[in-house]
């Protein structure tokens, strides 16, 4: 069991995102040093990641340095692979001491039963093409072959082809992943909280049975993060002045309060509302 608070963010796309959002990420990581709780990086933190024998992408160094400092301060860090940073290796695990996962994170966090997953490949027919190519991209033979490519050329090639993936992931304004999350929450014994990234659309959605779907949105567009405590989950945006501005908050429903869980049902538009104000674009 992980003890809250948990800080969750995703889709920073360092290497392709504006310098302002990458700098904000570095400052945020340094700000967490010495804090209690844990950090969850829910995929696509880097727009591309690969570990050659003696080389790694240079654009990642400021963020990796800040993560190393955060781990040295004692805060646990878990990195869940996305579709852009699925080739994690020894630098992340051994050098930095990060728990790097290529599978979803499922565990109890305080009073929450949580599932955290990046979200790529979950939308059925909408992701059919990606699902066909994903096993090839992640196959050990493909990884071995890519190590034969010069790091400069390999990095340039990967960054040059990544934009199409980012556009595709947000094509349905996050509704596909929202529906997947609500279906999981509705299952018998399902989680009380599902967190996805990938869509770049931020929002908190209450399920009819009281559970919650949360998405921090794309940090690479506007710095946002989720903060999970024992009683609630908050969605924050970091303003240009460096202050945390709460965009939304949902309390954890207990057995006593579940009869009132429908008070927020139907406010699916919160995802779209966040997008309409510019946070999810």
Identify what each model region corresponds to.
Residues 2-9, 14-109:
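Core catalytic region of metal-dependent phosphoesterases/phosphodiesterases
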Residues 15, 86, 123, 222, ...:
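Flexible, glycine-rich phosphate/dinucleotide-binding loops
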Residues 31-33, 70, 144-149, 165, ...:
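Short acidic/polar alpha-helix capping motifs at helix-coil junctions
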Residues 37-42, 69-73, 109-112, 144-151, ...:
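Short C-terminal domain-edge/linker segments immediately following a structured domain
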Residues 95-103, 113-115, 120, 124-132, ...:
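Conserved beta-sheet core of the metallophosphoesterase superfamily
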Residues 107-110, 206-281:
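Binuclear metal-dependent phosphoesterase catalytic core
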Residues 119-178:
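Active-site-proximal loop/helix segment associated with metal-binding centers of metalloenzymes
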Residues 163-165, 173, 180, 186, ...:
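C-terminal functional module detector
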């Amino acid at each position: 069991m992980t003890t809250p608070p948990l800080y969750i963010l995703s889709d920073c796309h360092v290497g392709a995102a504006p310098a302002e959002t990458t700098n904000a990420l570095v400052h945020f990581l340094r700000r967490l040093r010495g804090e209690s709780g844990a950090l969850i990086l829910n995929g696509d933190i880097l727009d591309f990641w690969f570990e050659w024998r003696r080389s790694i992408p240079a654009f990642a160094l400021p963020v990796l340095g800040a993560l190393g400092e955060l781990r040295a301060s004692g805060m646990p860090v878990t990195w869940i692979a996305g579709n852009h940073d699925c080739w994690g290796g020894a630098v992340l695990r051994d050098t930095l001491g990060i728990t790097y996962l290529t599978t979803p994170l499922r565990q109890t966090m305080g009073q929450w039963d949580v599932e955290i997953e990046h979200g790529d490949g979950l939308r059925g027919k909408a992701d059919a093409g990606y699902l066909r190519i994903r096993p090839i991209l992640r196959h050990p033979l493909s990884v071995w072959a890519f190590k034969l490519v010069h790091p400069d050329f390999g990095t340039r090639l990967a960054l040059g082809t990544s934009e199409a993936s980012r556009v595709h992931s947000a094509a349905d304004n996050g509704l596909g992943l929202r529906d997947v999350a609500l279906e999981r929450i509705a299952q018998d014994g399902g989680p009380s909280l599902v967190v996805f990234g990938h869509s770049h659309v931020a929002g908190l959605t209450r399920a009819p049975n009281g559970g919650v779907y949360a998405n921090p949105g794309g940090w690479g567009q506007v710095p946002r993060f989720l903060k999970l405590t024992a009683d609630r989950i908050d969605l924050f945006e970091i303003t240009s002045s460096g202050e945390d501005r709460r965009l939304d908050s949902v309390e954890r429903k207990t057995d006593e309060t579940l009869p009132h869980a429908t008070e927020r049902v139907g406010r699916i538009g919160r995802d779209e509302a966040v997008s309409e104000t510019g946070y999810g674009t």
